[in-house]
């Protein structure tokens, strides 16, 4: 009968053996099943893993480009709003000056 420590030692060795390997090396290695081609491992599994990596790289790159364009549009929009607000502010200040001039004129009468 095996002692607990010997069983644990044997299990550790088995786990290390089954989890060894790289991305696309087959089922149980590198993160689990990824389909029948990846399950087989070997060159086809590695090629499929490389294609997946490339797909997600391109997807992330496209998302970042979309985000950059969206933020640039937002900046342009807010710059336009800033100019509009400056013009409105100048109009209001001009109107206040006119009202103050009218008040002074009324006070002199």
From Swiss-Prot:
Main localization of the protein described in the UniProt heading: mitochondrion
- The reply on keyword Coiled coil is yes
Q: Where in the cell is it found?
A: Mitochondrion
Pfam families listed in its UniProt record:
IATP
UniProt xrefs under Gene3D superfamilies: Single helix bin
The family database entries (InterPro entries) matched by this protein are listed as: ATPase_inhibitor_mt
One GO CC annotation: mitochondrion
Q: What molecular functions are annotated in GO for this chain? A: ATPase inhibitor activity
Q: Where is the composition biased (Gly residues)?
A: 21-35
Q: Per the database entry, which stretches of residues form a coiled coil? A: 55-109
* Keywords assigned by UniProt, alphabetized: Coiled coil, Mitochondrion, Transit peptide
Q: A biological process (GO) annotation for this entry?
A: negative regulation of nucleotide metabolic process
Region Disordered: start-end pairs: 18-39, 73-109
What this chain does, per the entry, is described as: Thought to be a regulatory component of the ATP-synthesizing complex in the mitochondria. Activity is pH dependent.
Q: What else is known?
A: Mai-2 and tin-9.2 are transcribed on a dicistronic transcript where exos-4.1 is the upstream transcript and tin-9.2 the downstream.
Query: Which family is this sequence assigned to?
Result: Belongs to the ATPase inhibitor family.
Report the protein name in the record: ATPase inhibitor mai-2, mitochondrial
Where is the organism placed in the taxonomic lineage, from the top? Eukaryota, Metazoa, Ecdysozoa, Nematoda, Chromadorea
């Amino acid at each position: 009968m095996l002692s607990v420590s010997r069983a644990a030692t044997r299990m550790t060795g088995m786990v290390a053996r089954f989890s060894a390997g790289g991305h696309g090396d087959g089922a149980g290695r590198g993160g689990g099943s990824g389909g029948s081609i990846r399950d087989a491992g070997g060159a086809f599994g590695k090629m499929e893993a490389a294609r997946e990596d490339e797909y997600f790289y391109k997807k992330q790159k496209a998302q970042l480009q979309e985000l950059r364009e969206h933020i640039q549009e937002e900046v342009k929009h807010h710059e336009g709003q800033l100019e509009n607000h400056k013009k409105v502010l100048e109009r209001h200040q001009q109107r206040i000056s006119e009202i103050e001039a009218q008040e002074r004129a009324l006070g002199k009468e």
